[in-house]
Amino acid sequence: MGKIFFYEDKNFQGRSYECNSDCSDLSSYFNRCNSIRVESGNWILYEQPSYRGHQYYLWKGEYPDFQRWMGFNDSIRSCRMSPYHQGQYKMRISERGDFQGQNMEFFEDCPNTYDRFRFRDIHSCNVFDGNWMFYEEPNYRGRQYYLRPGEYRRYSDWGASSARIGSFRRVHHIF
């Protein structure tokens, strides 16, 4: 079981809320979130209720301001624990929607998709094993998209507004 603390102000000040399970709407517990302490577990945070909006992946540690978790603002409205995965990682990406066009399989992290293959956009993806994180920019920067095993027929299925993915990596658990 995981535990995460949300604070309204920077440097772990102001009103706080302790959470130890998935929560689809945090808005009744705090108005804004400017710092976070993850005591245990790995968490995916969302800017909007019902697990929507910008996503942020956090693990055990202290985040004294929202820029430390690559946040764009002080809005965190839902959270869920990342399920633990043991074993292989496997994902197939496609240059077009509905798994059309050129396909490539990956078992390892990719810090720069532009250097790795000829197409710059990922329009669909099938995650076979493990949990993965897509990033809009190379070197694991920019907006984050958390992917669990399953089919993603178009980029909007993983919450993106465009098909641009600059890097991706396997989600490893840190406790």
Curated annotation (Swiss-Prot):
Quaternary assembly: Monomer.
Family affiliation: Belongs to the beta/gamma-crystallin family.
Domain notes for this protein: Has a two-domain beta-structure, folded into four very similar Greek key motifs.
Region ranges (Connecting peptide): 84-88
BP term (GO), one: lens development in camera-type eye
Keyword Repeat: yes
The keyword Metal-binding is annotated on this UniProt entry: no
Keywords assigned: Eye lens protein, Repeat
GO MF annotation, one: structural constituent of eye lens
Annotated ranges, domain Beta/gamma crystallin 'Greek key': 2-40, 41-83, 89-129, 130-172
Organism superkingdom: Eukaryota
Matches recorded under InterPro entries: Beta/Gamma-Crystallin, Beta/gamma_crystallin, G_crystallin-like
Record-given protein name: Gamma-crystallin-3
Function: Crystallins are the dominant structural components of the vertebrate eye lens.
